[in-house]
Amino acid sequence: MRAQWPGQLWAALLALGALAGVVVGESNICTTRGVNSCQQCLAVSPVCAWCSDETLSQGSPRCNLKENLLKDNCAPESIEFPVSEAQILEARPLSSKGSGSSAQITQVSPQRIALRLRPDDSKIFSLQVRQVEDYPVDIYYLMDLSFSMKDDLSSIQTLGTKLASQMRKLTSNLRIGFGAFVDKPVSPYMYISPPQAIKNPCYNMKNACLPMFGYKHVLTLTDQVSRFNEEVKKQSVSRNRDAPEGGFDAIMQATVCDEKIGWRNDASHLLVFTTDAKTHIALDGRLAGIVLPNDGHCHIGTDNHYSASTTMDYPSLGLMTEKLSQKNINLIFAVTENVVSLYQNYSELIPGTTVGVLSDDSSNVLQLIVDAYGKIRSKVELEVRDLPEELSLSFNATCLNNEVIPGLKSCVGLKIGDTVSFSIEAKVRGCPQEKEQSFTIKPVGFKDSLTVQVTFDCDCACQAFAQPSSPRCNNGNGTFECGVCRCDQGWLGSMCECSEEDYRPSQQEECSPKEGQPICSQRGECLCGQCVCHSSDFGKITGKYCECDDFSCVRYKGEMCSGHGQCNCGDCVCDSDWTGYYCNCTTRTDTCMSTNGLLCSGRGNCECGSCVCVQPGSYGDTCEKCPTCPDACSFKKECVECKKFNRGTLHEENTCSRYCRDDIEQVKELTDTGKNAVNCTYKNEDDCVVRFQYYEDTSGRAVLYVVEEPECPKGPDILVVLLSVMGAILLIGLATLLIWKLLITIHDRKEFAKFEEERARAKWDTANNPLYKEATSTFTNITYRGT
């Protein structure tokens, strides 16, 4: 396996390559910009240095590479070459548990860092984040009490007890609260006719309803879960006139009224928003003549109702996002199927937000909250606050298995107690007017953060010893600073010896790089043998011969350097995370990261922040859709094995959470969910057939529907096996006996037939018994001659 290089090493190599490119070309950038002061020299490039030594040999440029200045015998102590640096100011170690006091719980390290950056330079620093165990949790349940949620209200009357029981498996310090909303109590959102409809909006439905209200805070966060149940039982529904609700008003007030709600500083904040309808957004208030924008402040009165409901417009998504981030609140949209796609879109615009599908009667809200909390705790995503305009940041994430993922500022699939780290490169563009600024980096939903104090090192130390009206500058015509004269208005020359009023045509040849070329590039005047560049409405003209400017670079979509870089003498110098001739190609890869944890789902290449699908049949923003791909089922099969059965390659490598981010739902049977569904079947290690379906809805939510029970071959019946074995033994014995008997019979028959055959062939003489011998015997005497 190829070794992974740390993000810092990659960044360092890239930086060295960039700096080398500055000097390897045809000319030295430090000596070709026509600078005449130390401050200008440092702004040319991070590789440039300035020599303030008065004894520097004549003709040697004071702005040069440091090694060149040393070769020119510039004293080392006279060289101005500030180096960007990072210094850790505070770094408490990360905590392992969250059961201590707030001051003892640390989830982000370091906490404070100081950066010193010279113009156009960058510095890399690291940040570690850990989700500690047993961290306190605050859950505020915000419910839609419009008439359509009547059955849901009865379903959550015991939610407090059940929720506490489930959440205490994850934390020993839980508090829950309750609030309700309907919509702004003003026409056209409410019924105003007939008059009795104001007090009882359900007058024509033979039901009694509460008068319509905007938002009311019912129960402050408490660890007494029985009180939650009691307060919920006291609630009744109301009724509004139009379909959308005023939920965003309620979210805003529940977020910013931290004292009323009781949010703790040292706890995870979960705001559960339940509804079955759309919601009004900013500018919808104009339907009721409400034009005052939402101010994002707390307006809960002594009666615990939202007092500005009829005078202030609904909040915008941007304002909600800002306030949720400031208060470290994770929003959970628990909404019904008919509006889930809308709230899925909202969640993409609000960091730290999750969406769950609520059943029609809210019976699954308990599991939904627990699952949503698990998703929140399994993800770490960084956000940046108050970043100076002149700074740009680029991120590299080291999540699981110490794998560095360039361009990513989030990690998913984490377990409680896991530690992740981020390598962050801060790069400054130019020289900001404010020399000291600060910004904050924090994980979404965390109270812990990293404060970065930045000092922009734009000045030279030798400027502190400047001599105004110095005799060295032609009897006081300028300030002697850093080894050169900075001439007063109206004076020019290296020693301020030439007045602008003087004019000698013979000096004009010194204002042209070559004979025959325009003087001062036709963008300046030659005074005393020195180019004085014109001012321009488009930008700044610089250079020894006025050959450079900051406005003549290429444009892309109407913006110079695509809006992602600076123009430096006709060339685009791209910001961090951007590259290309036009600076229009981002180097970030987080936009190419698919839900399975792979860049472009492993089916394409990430080019300029977008996936270019290369596998035939694949499509989608991250090449995630590919019904005809051979890996559509094989990869998801590994996720099913890992997440449902806790086995398989991904489980053994502990990468299940990273590569398998789809929701898994168990079903009894697979149904036809449309053309975006892919049915898959495989045999597991137990030789059982597992069937599942991969489905992606219109909102982009991917789900794996897995049949609860795999189809396994039935095991043998023991009794049948025993009887079969015994029967087989008996049959074999009987068969053996029969065969033996048959063989014996055949053998006997053959012998008997042989006997009969031999007996039939026998020829016996029946006249004499060959065994009988007569009593007399007759012998003939051969010698007897008859005499």
From Swiss-Prot:
GO terms for molecular function: C-X3-C chemokine binding; enzyme binding; extracellular matrix binding; fibrinogen binding; fibroblast growth factor binding; fibronectin binding; identical protein binding; insulin-like growth factor I binding. It is found in: Cell membrane; Cell projection, Lamellipodium membrane; Cell junction, Focal adhesion; Postsynaptic cell membrane. Residues 1-25 form the signal peptide. Residues 202-209 are annotated as: Involved in CX3CL1-, NRG1-, FGF1- and IGF1-binding. Phosphorylated on tyrosine residues in response to thrombin-induced platelet aggregation. Probably involved in outside-in signaling. Ca(2+) 1 binds at S148, D151, D152, D276. Disruption phenotype: Animals are viable and fertile. Residues 29-75 form the PSI domain. Keywords: Calcium, Cell adhesion, Cell junction, Cell membrane, Cell projection, Disulfide bond, EGF-like domain, Glycoprotein, Integrin, Magnesium, Membrane, Metal-binding, Phosphoprotein, Postsynaptic cell membrane, Receptor, Repeat, Signal, Synapse, Transmembrane, Transmembrane helix. Residues 741-787 are cytoplasmic. Heterodimer of an alpha and a beta subunit. Beta-3 (ITGB3) associates with either alpha-IIB (ITGA2B) or alpha-V (ITGAV). Interacts with FLNB and COMP. Interacts with PDIA6 following platelet stimulation. Interacts with SYK; upon activation by ITGB3 promotes platelet adhesion. Interacts with MYO10. Interacts with DAB2. Interacts with FERMT2. Integrin ITGAV:ITGB3 interacts with FBLN5 (via N-terminus). Interacts with EMP2; regulates the levels of the heterodimer ITGA5:ITGB3 integrin expression on the plasma membrane. ITGAV:ITGB3 interacts with CCN3. This is Integrin beta-3. It comes from Mus musculus (Mouse).
